[in-house]
């Protein structure tokens, strides 16, 4: 069997995922698409609007992703694709989250015994 990762580029960009949780998988079909692009794809595929436009939330604490992040996915997606973010404090927050969470996208470091024996 195979496990499909459901994270998208927007979530990955700011680390809004759980390592070995929702970010786990053998293939990431949405990994190079922003939230806005995923929504467009959903519409193109004819998915019900209530699913396509559902407010993103982790379902754990009653607040939305955007409330927790402090900016909208539309703002984030524009910054990812065009490099444009009109609010300097939001741009700094996005850059900070991206830098802090890049490790989530990297393979697990492995111990290399050869380097210790040289």
Regions found by a protein language model. Give the residues of each.
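ATP/NTP-dependent adenylation/nucleotidyl-transfer catalytic domains that generate, transfer
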Residues: 1-2, 7-118
């Amino acid at each position: 069997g195979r496990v499909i990762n459901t994270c998208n580029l927007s979530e990955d960009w700011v680390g809004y995922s759980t390592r070995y949780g929702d970010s786990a998988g053998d293939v990431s079909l949405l990994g190079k698409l922003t939230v806005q692009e995923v929504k467009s794809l959903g519409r193109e595929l004819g998915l019900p609007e209530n699913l396509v436009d559902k407010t993103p939330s982790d379902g754990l604490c009653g607040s939305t992703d955007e409330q927790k992040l402090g900016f909208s996915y539309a703002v984030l997606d524009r910054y990812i694709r065009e490099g444009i973010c009109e609010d300097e404090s939001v741009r700094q927050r996005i850059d900070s989250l991206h830098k802090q969470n890049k490790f989530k996208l990297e393979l697990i470091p492995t111990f290399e015994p050869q380097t210790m024996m040289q």
